[in-house]
């Protein structure tokens, strides 16, 4: 999960590595790496979005109960 978050914060690092691999692979395997990288990026962004929306929802619930009381 930490690697996923790192990849989302710094996507250029992973993309550069994948694209240089694609240049060296002339048998077509590089393209599949790019596709896998794109899928990984989408899953990463989805996870980060779900986490941030869930955390903001939880904090708003906590704020609401703190102000309204039992």
UniProtKB/Swiss-Prot annotation:
Highest taxon in the source lineage: Bacteria
Name this polypeptide is given: Putative uncharacterized protein b0309
């Amino acid at each position: 999960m930490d690697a996923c978050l790192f990849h989302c914060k710094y996507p250029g690092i992973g993309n550069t590595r994948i694209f240089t691999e694609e240049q060296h692979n002339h048998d077509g395997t590089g393209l599949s790496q790019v596709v896998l990288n794109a899928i990984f990026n989408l899953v990463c962004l989805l996870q980060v979005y779900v986490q941030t929306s869930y955390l903001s929802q939880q904090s708003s619930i906590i704020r609401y109960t703190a102000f309204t009381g039992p």
